[in-house]
């Protein structure tokens, strides 16, 4: 399965003819946040692939104007094309009273509240996050620190891959690194865009099928569900 992952910076080349070919080649499109609703909605016009998104720390407008035709994975495990995708958007809290920012303790509580959902799903295959892991591709300033609680989450559930954004290439002073690893699991900064192919060893057969617990606002295909 060929996955196009997006984050933070709209990619100009995706608006042209080359971009249309890139979109058509994708089996699945994932957004790690901080992208305009119109940008994600545009993608759905040129691809039959599902577009799955979470919130970045600047995406407070998604509540009133969500991306049309896209699957919202924020705070849930969603089953799309046999992949169990866990969505944990937002950044570390560096301003008060912003609903897309969380303290370390708040993010840890979010994960704890998902335990029952994770059990029903039998785990997850992809962690779709906005922020990185603490100490792994994050930065020293408060606004761009990662979350420590992502480490035990990955080690316990052993997903295929984690995608995130938030740390822009322009912020990294020539030290930008897209692909890192935590406990043997690839951790990829998808800022701008990144194309990823699932390993041949992955199989959707382990993903359980269950009825959606609530209706998804999406152009969902059969089998695309909330757990």
PLM segments and residue spans:
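Active-site environment of divalent metal-dependent phosphoester hydrolases
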Residues: 10-14, 35-41, 57-63, 93-97, ...
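A short, gly/pro- and small-residue-rich
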Residues: 47-58, 147-150
């Amino acid at each position: 399965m060929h996955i196009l992952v997006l984050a933070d910076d709209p990619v100009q080349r995706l608006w042209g003819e080359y971009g249309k070919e890139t979109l058509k080649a994708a089996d699945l499109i994932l957004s790690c946040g901080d992208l305009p609703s119109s940008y994600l909605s545009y993608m759905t016009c040129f691809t039959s692939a599902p577009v799955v998104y979470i919130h970045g720390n600047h995406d407070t407008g998604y509540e009133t104007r969500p991306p049309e035709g896209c699957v919202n994975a924020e705070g849930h495990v969603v089953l799309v094309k046999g992949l169990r995708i866990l969505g944990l958007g937002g950044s570390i809290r560096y301003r008060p009273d912003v609903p897309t920012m969380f303290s370390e303790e708040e993010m840890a509580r979010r994960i704890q509240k998902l335990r029952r959902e994770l059990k029903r799903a039998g785990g997850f295959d992809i962690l779709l996050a906005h922020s990185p892991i603490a100490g792994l591709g994050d930065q020293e300033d408060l606004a761009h620190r990662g979350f420590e609680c992502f480490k035990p989450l990955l080690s316990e559930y052993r997903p295929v891959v984690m995608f995130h954004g938030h740390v822009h290439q322009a912020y990294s002073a020539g030290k930008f690194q897209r692909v890192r690893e935590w406990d043997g699991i690839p951790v990829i900064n998808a800022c701008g865009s990144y194309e990823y192919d699932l390993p041949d060893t992955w199989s959707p057969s382990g993903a359980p099928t269950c009825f959606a617990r609530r209706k998804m606002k999406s152009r969902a295909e059969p089998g695309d569900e909330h757990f």
